[in-house]
């Protein structure tokens, strides 16, 4: 048995993912601290010297990084791609500029092979059942010499929140589970053996667990597993969560285990 087969996290359907993120389009940018941090690091991995006439932001959401990609490659046509039509509509309204927008499934991009110079994908593939088809599709559309930079989350993300919930509501999942680091490495190497993969722990402070939960909802990143409760969480359960969540210097901390993938297609 491969690492990939062991304890695969349950992922919501594409419809649920698109619905949740679309519903969060108006609140997303104000809450997207992690997305900004990871996206800026990802952007820095794209060399300005790359000759680029066509750039994709895959899983663009509200189009937060589309202007930055355009500034980095002023001669390029930048296209924001997202599964959520609501997100793409929001991005089109909010981002003034000569950009293109596309509603599409990352596993089946309506683009010619070898037609793109750079693919930028920030915090998208963790919502895929299996990242390998998406990575393979990214490599398919890359031109020789083109680059893929991609970020995702791995196991251990929001571990403080998960531990607190298990004290309050044992045996019930409340936090999304992500692929283990060794499994992600195996998946990436299966598609792109020359890729570089790096890991970073990002820790963000919050005033309370309630602020953390509100931020996740504002991002459309609330728990998506099939076992989630179908009713509103009782106030008493939330109070117990606040009591169980560890505090440091009056605030609570949330850890995110980030992974960054960089690949350059050989000429």
Go through each PLM region and give its residues.
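Conserved catalytic/acceptor-binding region of the Class I
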Residues: 132, 147-211, 222-232
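Conserved alpha-helix/loop element of class I SAM-dependent methyltransferases that forms part
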Residues: 33-52, 68
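Conserved Class I S-adenosyl-L-methionine
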Residues: 62-64, 196-267
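A short SAM/SAH-binding and catalytic strip from SAM-dependent methyltransferases
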Residues: 118-130
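A short acidic, Gly/Pro-enriched loop at the edge of an enzyme's catalytic core
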Residues: 107-118
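Class I SAM-dependent methyltransferase SAM/SAH-binding core
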Residues: 54-108
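Class I SAM-dependent methyltransferase Rossmann-like catalytic core
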Residues: 4-37
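A short glycine-rich, Lys/Arg-flanked "PGG" loop and its adjoining helix->strand segment in the class I
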Residues: 132-144
């Amino acid at each position: 048995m491969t690492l990939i087969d062991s304890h695969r996290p349950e992922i919501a359907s594409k419809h649920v993912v698109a619905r949740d993120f679309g519903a969060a389009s108006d609140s997303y940018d104000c809450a997207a601290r992690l997305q900004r941090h990871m996206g800026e690091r990802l952007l820095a991995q794209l060399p300005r010297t790359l000759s680029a006439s066509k750039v994709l932001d895959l899983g663009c959401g509200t189009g937060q990084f589309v202007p930055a990609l355009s500034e980095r490659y002023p001669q390029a046509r930048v296209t924001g791609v997202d599964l959520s039509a609501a997100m793409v509509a929001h991005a089109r309204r909010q981002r003034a500029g000569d950009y293109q927008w596309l509603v599409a499934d990352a596993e089946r991009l309506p683009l010619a092979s070898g037609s793109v110079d750079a693919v930028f994908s920030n915090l998208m593939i963790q919502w895929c059942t299996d990242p390998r088809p998406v990575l393979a599709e990214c490599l398919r559309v890359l031109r020789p010499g083109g680059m893929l930079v991609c970020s995702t989350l791995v196991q251990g993300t929001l571990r403080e929140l998960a531990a607190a919930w298990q004290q309050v509501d044992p045996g019930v999942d409340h936090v999304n589970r992500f692929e283990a680091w060794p499994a992600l490495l195996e998946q990436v190497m299966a598609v792109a053996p020359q890729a570089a993969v790096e890991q970073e722990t990002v820790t963000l402070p919050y005033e309370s667990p309630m602020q953390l939960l509100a931020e996740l909802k504002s991002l459309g990143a609330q728990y998506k597993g099939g076992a989630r409760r179908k009713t509103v969480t009782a106030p008493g359960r939330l109070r117990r969560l606040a009591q169980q969540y560890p505090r440091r210097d009056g605030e609570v901390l949330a850890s995110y285990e980030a992974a960054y993938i960089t690949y350059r297609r050989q000429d």
